[in-house]
Regions:
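Glycine-rich, flexible loop segments associated with nucleotide phosphate handling
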Residues: 78-81, 146-150, 175-178
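Low-complexity, polar-biased intrinsically disordered regions enriched in Pro/Ser/Thr/Gly
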Residues: 61-66, 119, 169-170
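A structure-centric signal for secondary-structure junctions around beta-strands
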Residues: 1-3, 101, 126, 175-178
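Residue-level recognition of short, structured coil/turn motifs
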Residues: 29, 33-37, 146, 163, ...
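Active-site-proximal segment of zinc-dependent metalloprotease catalytic domains
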Residues: 93-166
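Propeptide-to-catalytic entry region of secreted or membrane-anchored zinc metalloproteases
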Residues: 1-114
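Metalloprotease/metallohydrolase-associated module, dominated by Zn2+-dependent proteases
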Residues: 127-144, 165-224
């Protein structure tokens, strides 16, 4: 089973870290619970919360020697925002990803932009890695609402990291149900969807839950 590496910048607050890590744990538990209760040979994946790591006895400025190196290498100095495509490319090319493939999920405080220069809240390489940011969420006056939105954003990118929805099953890469896998490209929509899903008492819809379980099995047996 592929492990899940969690990283975040030092500027992420303690309450944000707690929501981030606990939400990943909950999402993976939901996925694992879709597997047969008896006779399953698939263990739950190990979740490794590394935070802002630095390799022991290494110069932090050396290639792949620290989480900060990834950030510095992907930072757009003109806009002071992170180039997400560049960041994820570095993650996928790291030496230990080649030796022991695993999932990567990163939470940062700075603004993000994609390859077309568009401002975004997160980006994923489906089935491999994802990055998300609290930058937009911190514009909210209500801290509780910001944490609820962070929970929803984290659940969405855990699903993306696992490559859910499965397009071959549904013919689309976007979920249409009341579900955290619905894309929310604006802060207003993210808040609206978060509140709607809370009121409905749901996170992942039934189909997305099933597909997350399938993805865990696939990663365990090398089909991811």
């Amino acid at each position: 089973m592929r492990s899940i590496s969690l990283t975040w910048t030092d500027e992420i607050g303690d309450d944000e870290v707690i929501v981030f890590v606990s939400t990943v744990q909950k999402a993976i538990q939901i996925a694992w619970e879709q597997l047969p209760k008896e006779g399953t040979l698939v263990p739950p994946p190990e979740i490794k919360p590394f935070g802002n790591w630095v390799l022991e006895n290494a110069d932090p400025e050396m290639d792949y020697a620290s989480f900060q190196w990834y950030l510095d290498s992907a930072l757009d100095r003109e806009t002071d925002s992170l180039h997400t495509d560049r960041f994820l490319e570095l993650v996928l090319r790291e030496p230990w990803q080649q030796r022991a493939p695993h999932y990567d999920l990163s939470l940062v405080h700075m603004p993000l932009h994609d390859g077309k220069g568009r401002s975004i809240s997160g980006l994923a390489v489906r089935g491999r890695a994802a990055i998300l940011s609290v930058h937009r969420l911190r514009s909210l006056q209500d801290n509780w609402l910001a944490l609820i939105a962070l929970r929803r954003l984290t659940m969405h990118y855990v699903g993306q990291m696992l490559a859910v929805p499965i397009p071959d099953v549904r013919g689309t890469m976007d979920c249409q149900a009341v579900c955290v896998m619905r894309p929310a490209d604006t802060l207003a929509r993210l808040i609206a969807y978060s509140e709607q899903e809370i009121n409905a008492g749901t996170s992942y819809c039934e189909q997305c839950r099933l597909e997350m379980g399938q993805r865990l099995v696939g990663s365990h047996f090398g089909n991811n």
